[in-house]
Amino acid sequence: MKRIKMHHFGGKNICATWDEVAQTLEQTVDGVNEFYIAAEHTMFPYLAVLVKGDYAYVHCVPNETDGGLIAFSDDTPTDLPQDGISIFYTNTPTEEIEIYNDYVIPKTLAWTVVKDFVETGEMSNCVEWEEL
């Protein structure tokens, strides 16, 4: 695994192992956080992971000219209303962003997406991806 930089509401961590990444992912401010995850000294590709309680939203940006892709999973449903919207937080623990529940996945699945990304540098196959 390459060294990974993780920006989040609490600051920035440089992680050399999956255990360090996992410890960083557990950091929240009132149960929420936003993580920007990329290999150290690079900007792309990166994952943006928004976390709220047991749920997450994952957005991958492969390069600077790509709008990115959003993770979703029909195989791992949540108990959220299918046609609803969930509030997550971006930039600060108080700035709200609305996310369609179709793109909200269990936090445990998001951690698998992150693990695959930090170990391989590739997008995970454990979810489907929709291009923006």
What are these regions (language model features)?
Residues 1-32, 61-132:
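Acidic, proline/glycine-rich low-complexity IDRs
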